[in-house]
UniProtKB/Swiss-Prot annotation:
Keyword flag Cytoplasm: yes
GO CC terms: axoneme; centriole; ciliary basal body; cilium; cytoplasm; cytosol; intercellular bridge; microtubule cytoskeleton
Residues the record lists as Phosphoserine modifications: 426
Protein name: Cilium assembly protein DZIP1L
Entry coiled-coil feature ranges: 205-406
Protein species of origin: Homo sapiens (Human)
Keyword tags: Cell projection, Ciliopathy, Cilium, Coiled coil, Cytoplasm, Cytoskeleton, Disease variant, Metal-binding, Phosphoprotein, Zinc, Zinc-finger
Record field: compositional bias (Polar residues): 533-547, 574-588, 658-675
Length: 767
């Protein structure tokens, strides 16, 4: 326990400041103990509940009571001296602790007062500090302005030079002119010597100016060096970024080219596979139809030996087995196609997913221009996806076509009569049928013209893809001369490749050239034999062997001169002709549109007056094919109408509109005789070259009304590989009433099948 002196010393330490400890002495004790009150207290409860209030109430009575006269209530003996001593010592301790408590309370109150005072002083000090900081900020701003002003004045001083100012040699003042300086010297420095002091004043000023000039030059050099270094660093960074963009673009282009090549290869394989399967099915169908036709032809033959008993059941069973085998094979092929399409679709989806991930990764690192290129690639991918869907639709249509052919064969087999000669079904006949399968396909297509409508979208898509591969868009109305020259070189290379691939290519071309030339000569000779009316010029040539090259490349015409019709023509006549079961329709040309081309003063054989098709296909030759057949009289101006884009589409409405001709016009008989001769020549079948596709014509539907005279037909065809064999089967039935006028390419499809009965006749579908 500390002594009172130590306690006083602790209270008067630095923590409590200069607090004075009051004088302490023990008080006398005269009060008696209140035993009744003590007996009511529960000491255990006070200790358990920490009842400090009860202790505070009883502390005074216990501390200041006198226990010397206390005796035991039971035995009446006084309190034990040792116990009494302990109780008195406890009273003294409690009294001292109460004194310490009072001192501490007073010290705490004093310290709280001092704390409040210190807090007030601190707040005032902070306010003063903020005010001084504001003042310091203002002083700094003022100092900065003054430094700027001084530097500006120094720069002006260095720029203008010291000779512009007049400095007093006796003080630091400077004047604008010498008058002010003299006045200043007279006022302030009268009678003062000038020599030594002026020199002392000029030397420090010159030194300061030189030092400032040196610092300025050094600062400018440092700034220039820093600018140059920063410029070099920016150039290097820009070059590095540009190189990275170029490398990323090259990688993206290479990857895109590889993916395009892979996709085109897969599409070509799939198209080739489907085309081979379709050819096989068509061959089988044509074979069965030929057998059915043979059975039908044999059924009408009557035996002169009497009624014979035919083996109908065996023949019917054999045909049923063949039909069942064909159905099974068709189902197998269909299943195989579906499986292959599914595999290709799964592979395409996997590749598409990989390409999308790769595309996203590349797009994150591409610049704005490369993102635009990636968007264009995405559009092309969408186009290819649409083409694949179109291919699937075409496959479905082919399957429906195969089913329809199979059903038709079943009906034909059930209609076979009983009188069948079993000896005709020999292996030799099957061999001949397999060799003539192409002719059977043609016959089947003639009997069912609706099948050709299914092939038209396929051929249109193929042609559009081929044109797009050569750089010609689908909606292009024409091509430039530079593009035409590029396509000419490309087609020339492709023709050379085909000539190397197919050994008979050149010989077939030569054969076709000779055949066309010979037919043109025959038509010319036949046309020259026909007599002419009086006052009319003679026939020059029907088709010249010279193929005139037009001003625009890839356009060739064959000129045919026809005589003018008499002033009063005979009444209209009707005629019908047939070749290979196809109808030859009369050609009637509408009046040319005056807004398109004006009349030409030169004969139509001259090049610049002709129109050029927007493109030529890859199978075109240099000068051995007919693109336009022009039938014109001499000294008659011609009008050319550009060929529209969709010249394959025509309708009954268009043909009926073209048939509305003004009455009262006559015609000659020259064209009729020429058409008959041409039909006889075209009836002979010609060998189809490799890669050629025939144009099939429908059976003749009846006579047709003669076309309006006063027109000169001009027939033209695209130079494509689909038209190599079209010259063998193309009928040109020219009306005997026609007066020669140019027939434009845009109106050519509308002329076939016109007349009073044209709406009921089947159209001539073309591939």
């Amino acid at each position: 326990m500390q002594s009172p002196a130590a306690t006083a010393e602790g209270l008067s330490g630095p923590l409590f400041g200069a607090y004075t400890f009051p004088t302490f002495k023990f008080q006398p004790r005269h009060d008696s103990m209140d035993w009744r009150r003590i007996s009511t207290l529960d000491v255990d409860r006070v200790a358990r509940e920490l009842d400090v209030a009860t202790l505070q109430e009883n502390i005074a009575g216990i501390t200041f009571c006198n226990l010397d006269r206390e005796v035991c209530s039971r035995c009446g003996q006084p309190v034990d001296p040792a116990l009494l001593k302990v109780l008195r010592l406890a009273q003294l301790i409690i009294e001292y602790l109460l004194h310490c408590q009072d001192c501490l309370s007073a010290s705490v109150a004093q310290l709280e007062a001092r704390l409040q005072t210190s807090l007030g002083q601190q707040q005032r000090g902070q306010q003063e500090l903020g005010r001084q900081a504001d003042e310091l900020k203002g002083v700094r701003e003022e100092s900065r302005r003054r430094r700027k002003m001084i530097s500006t004045l120094q720069q002006l001083l260095m720029q203008t030079g010291t000779h512009s100012y007049h400095t007093c040699h006796l003080c630091d003042k400077t004047f604008m002119n010498a008058t002010f300086l003299r006045g200043h010297i007279q006022r302030r420095h009268a009678g003062v010597a000038e020599g030594g002091k002026q020199k002392k004043q000029e030397q420090p000023v010159e030194e300061v100016l030189e030092e400032l000039r040196a610092k300025l030059k050094w600062t400018q050099g440092e700034l220039e060096a820093q600018r140059e270094a920063e410029r070099q660093r920016q150039l290097q960074e820009a070059e590095l970024i540009h190189q990275r963009e170029i490398e990323a673009k090259k990688e993206f282009d290479k990857w895109k080219e590889q993916e395009w090549t892979k996709l085109y290869g897969e599409i070509d394989k799939l198209k080739k596979l489907f085309w081979d399967e379709f050819k096989n099915v068509a061959k089988q169908n044509s074979t069965l139809e030929e057998k059915l036709r043979a059975l039908q032809s044999h059924s009408v033959m009557e035996s002169k030996l009497g009624s014979l008993r035919d083996e109908e059941s065996e023949e019917w069973l054999r045909q049923a087995r063949e039909l069942q085998a064909l159905r099974e094979k068709t189902e197998i092929q269909k299943t195989e196609w579906k499986r292959k399409v599914k595999e290709l679709h799964e592979e395409h989806m996997a590749e598409k997913k990989e390409l999308q991930e790769e595309n996203q990764r590349l797009q994150a690192s591409l610049s704005q221009d490369q993102k635009k290129a990636a968007a264009q690639s995405q559009c092309q991918i969408s186009t290819l996806r649409a083409q694949l869907q179109e291919q699937a639709r075409i496959i479905a249509s082919q399957e429906e076509m195969i089913q329809s052919l199979s059903l038709r064969k079943v009906e034909g087999i059930h209609k076979v009569p009983k009188a069948v000669d079993t000896e005709e079904d020999s292996p030799e006949e099957e061999m001949e049928d397999s060799q003539d399968e192409q002719h059977k396909v043609l016959a089947a297509l003639r009997r069912n013209p609706t099948l050709l409508k299914h092939f038209r979208p396929i051929l249109e898509d193929t042609l559009e893809e081929k044109l797009e591969s050569m750089g010609i868009r689908k909606d292009a109305k024409g091509i430039s001369i530079q593009t035409l020259r590029h396509l000419e070189s490309l087609l020339r290379v492709q023709r050379e490749q085909k000539a190397r691939k197919f050994s008979e290519f050149l010989s077939l071309r030569g054969k076709l050239v000779k055949e066309v030339t010979s037919r043109a000569k025959e038509r010319q000779e036949n046309g020259a034999v026909v007599s002419q009316p009086d006052g009319q010029p003679s026939v020059k040539s029907q088709q010249s062997t010279l193929v005139t090259r037009e001003a625009q490349p890839k356009t060739r015409t064959l000129q045919v001169a026809l005589p003018s019709t008499p002033a009063e023509p005979p009444p209209p006549t009707r005629q019908s002709h047939g070749s290979h079961g196809s109808s030859l329709t009369q050609v009637s040309a509408p009046a040319p549109r005056p807004g398109l081309h004006g009349p030409s003063s030169t004969p139509p054989s001259s090049g610049p007056g002709m129109s050029t098709p927007p493109f030529s296909s890859e199978e075109d030759s240099e000068g051995d094919r007919v693109q336009r057949v022009s039938l014109q009289p001499p000294k008659v101006p011609s009008r050319m109408v550009p060929r529209p884009k969709d010249d394959w589409d025509w309708s009954d409405t268009e043909t009926s509109e073209e048939n509305a001709q003004p009455p009262g016009q006559g015609s000659g008989t020259l064209v009729q005789s020429m058409v008959k001769n041409l039909e006889k020549q075209l009836e002979a079948p010609a060998k189809k070259p490799a890669g050629g596709v025939s144009l099939f014509f429908m059976p003749n539907a009846g006579p047709q009304r003669a076309a309006t005279p006063g027109r000169k037909p001009q027939l033209s065809e695209d130079e494509s590989d689909l038209e190599i064999s079209s010259l063998e089967d193309l009928p040109l039935d020219l009306d005997q009433r026609e007066k020669p006028k140019p027939l434009s390419r845009s109106k050519l499809p509308e002329k076939f099948g016109t007349g009073p009965q044209s709406s009921g006749q089947p159209r001539v579908p073309a591939w």
